[in-house]
Amino acid sequence: MAKEGTKVPRIKLGSQGLEVSAQGLGCMGMSAFYGPPKPEPDMIQLIHHAINSGITLLDTSDVYGPHTNEILLGKALKGGTRERVVLATKFGIVLGDEKKAEGKRAVHGDPAYVRAACEASLKRLDIDCIDLYYQHRVDTRVPIEITVGELKKLVEEGKLKYIGLSEASASTIRRAHAVHPITAVQLEWSLWSRDVEEEIIPTCRELGIGIVAYSPLGRGFLSSGPKLLEDMSNEDYRKYLPRFQAENLENNKNLYERICEMAVRKGCTPSQLALAWVHHQGNDVCPIPGTTKIENLNQNMKPCPSS
C-alpha cells in the first residue's frame, strides 16, 4: 500500500485494460447487513474522503438495502466525482421482505432479469454505464453461457464496460470466460478464509482474470476480535454466522490473538497486518475492506511495516 500522504498505487484488474486502486472500498455496511443504515451525509463524506485519498474502486450491489446503497453512491458521485472512480455493482440476489422474513433469498440469472436489473441499477446510480458488473451469485437453473450472453449484449450496447462473477466455481468461471472475457472474480479471501486457493485462484490466474477480495478483515473480526460481538445489534447478520457462534469463537479468538502478537512485532494494527497479507498474495488482487468510519479507512490505507 501507499505510504501516508501519497496516493494509492494502481493495479491492472484482469486482461481487458481495467485499472483500479490497489485497494477498494466495500460500501455494503453503510446501508445494510451490518446493523442499521448509517447517516447518509456521513457516508457521503466517507466516500469522498476515500476518493480524495486515492481509492478508485467502489463496490456496491442492488441487494444492499436493497437498492439504497446504490442510491447512496449515486448521490455521492455527483458533481464530477463519477469520472474519478471505477464503479462496481452486482445483480442476481433477490431479497424482498417476504424472503427476508423467511431468512431466504432467490437467485436469478435469466436474460430478462439480467437486463431489467442492469437498467434499474443504472437508474439508481444515475449513470449511463456501469464500469464493472458482477453476477452476485450464480443461478444454477440457468446455464452460465445464457447469463453471460446477455451481459455481453449489454457491453455491446454501451451499458456495461466489464463483466465479473462473484462466488463462482472454477468450472463456471471457465465456461463464462469462453463466452465473453471475465475481468474480475469477487470472492472471500482473508487469513481465515482460504478455501479459494485450491482451485479458484489458480483458474483466475490461468485465464488472466483479476481477483477482488471481499471481507479481507474477516467481516471485522480480524480488526476487533471477540469484542466485535459486544456492540452488534440484532439487525447485524454477522451475529448469526457460524464463525461468530460460541462453539467456534474460542478457536477464532486464538487466531486473533496470534495476529495481534504478529502485528505488535511488525509495529502495526491487526487490520493492517491482515490487509498486508492479502496484498502480498499478488498484484492481481484488490481487497475491498468496508468501513463506516473515516479513522478506520485511514488506518486501513496505511501500510504494515515490512509488509
From Swiss-Prot:
Any one GO molecular function term: aldo-keto reductase (NADPH) activity
Single biological process term from Gene Ontology: auxin-activated signaling pathway
Residues annotated as the enzyme's active site: 64 (proton donor)
Induction: By auxin.
Residues marked Lowers pKa of active site Tyr (site): 90
Name used for this protein in its record: Auxin-induced protein PCNT115
SUPFAM superfamilies per record: NAD(P)-linked oxidoreductase (SSF51430)
Binding site for substrate: 136
Sequence positions that bind NADP(+): 215-225
Family recorded in the similarity comment: Belongs to the aldo/keto reductase family. Aldo/keto reductase 2 subfamily.
Keyword line: Auxin signaling pathway, NADP, Oxidoreductase
UniProt KW NADP keyword: yes
One Pfam family hit: Aldo_ket_red
One of the record's GO cellular component terms: cytoplasm
